Amino acid sequence: MEFEVKSPILGFESVRGMRLEKIDDLFMKLKNAEADSPVFTLVNPFLLREYDFEIPLAMKVLLDLKENTNLLVLNIMIIHTPLESSTVNFLAPVIFNFDNHTMGQLVLESHRYPAYGLAETISSFFNSDSTPTQEA
């Protein structure tokens, strides 16, 4: 599904359209709709940990978010080898509005969300049997 970028992903301000593709319940891929790059691996944070933040009014207006908006929140994951050492950025969620096909990255204030890191290792959220430690 294609989305219009209303608040760009940091470092990719010129990208205006992105395509979201589901891999499975935990992972998705986000690709530039008009070029070969950038391509991001995204993760559903709610399947990994308790994750809650306030969406500022400016972002709500930009994405036209309402009380009943069909939205999805994902986080960018940096893939490493081995996969268990891959990291997740919980301080800059990507928000998708499925009702109007808009999206944007929100940068959270680290002092307001000290439990969230820029590069948290994904293995810290899994038990030894490879299942997430908690579900939302």
UniProtKB/Swiss-Prot annotation:
GO terms for cellular component: cytoplasm. Its main location: cytoplasm. It is found in: Cytoplasm. Keywords: Bacterial flagellum biogenesis, Chaperone, Cytoplasm, Translation regulation. GO terms for biological process: bacterial-type flagellum assembly; regulation of translation. Belongs to the FliW family. Acts as an anti-CsrA protein, binds CsrA and prevents it from repressing translation of its target genes, one of which is flagellin. Binds to flagellin and participates in the assembly of the flagellum. Interacts with translational regulator CsrA and flagellin(s). This is Flagellar assembly factor FliW 2. The gene is fliW2.
